[in-house]
């Protein structure tokens, strides 16, 4: 059965998701990023609303004073006030928006993702058949549903709010500065409603995009088998790996820290391991020559190992015995005497 005729009923493996992430294929939620940025901006306006209100009130009051001043002086004062108002409101607002976009993108993408793969030319992007296929996909249906939801819910919420404030807005020119605080209070309420609605919509979109992405990344049984085969290799390769692991497991652990008796000769050091009930005969677990022998000797001293000076036996063991193997039978007697003297046998 071919891959095209099989049903993609299995979830994507971690390897497939990791490879897709390296290619820049991740669930993207632009609504969540926009909602986070908008909430940051609205939150800033909410927290700094009183300061902005005072600045705007000051600008409106200054308008009457500027009418009686010479034109050049009036323009200069108006520009100074405009710059102060911009720095006090727009500057922090842009910083909040920029920071929120970066943070929301990192949260939505679960870290920083950089890939040039999406920028490469792809014929499928301009293929009309692929476009028609995407048009009838579940993702397109979800996008249409999201658009309708935003239009109906957000539009209805804002409409109800404006209906409650329409009388205030109508009498605002007559009311003058006395209604200025009412307008800002209403604006804060509108900000709170809008921020809450946008954030909820962004979180819902984030969950939807992840669910759709995992749905698109589903695999067939054949794809899973192929991936497993690529990871583990052919049966022959797996058998060879198993054989090497078994050989390594059967070999005794080596190193001076495994030794119980050390023989030292001229520029030669031999380490043997013999533990009653564990090893039937002494095993050669370490050996060194030259500078390495000096380093190993100091390490053996630090480990408080029994050290025997025997130049002849040390050189004989060095030339006749391999690491991890038992000592030859002809050396049993002198080594047994050393073990007895050290209280190891």
UniProtKB/Swiss-Prot annotation:
Looking at the UniProt entry, the stretches that span the membrane are 87-107, 151-171, 189-209
Q: Name one GO cellular component term.
A: plasma membrane
Top-level lineage group: Bacteria
Pfam family name, one: Bac_export_2
> Is Glycoprotein among this UniProt entry's keywords?
no
Record InterPro entries: T3SS_substrate_exporter, T3SS_substrate_exporter_C
- Localization, UniProt: Cell membrane
- Keyword Iron included in the entry's annotation: no
Q: How does it sit in the membrane?
A: Multi-pass membrane protein
Name the family.
Answer: Belongs to the type III secretion exporter family.
What PANTHER family is this protein classified in? FLAGELLAR BIOSYNTHETIC PROTEIN FLHB
Q: What is this protein called?
A: Probable translocation protein y4yO
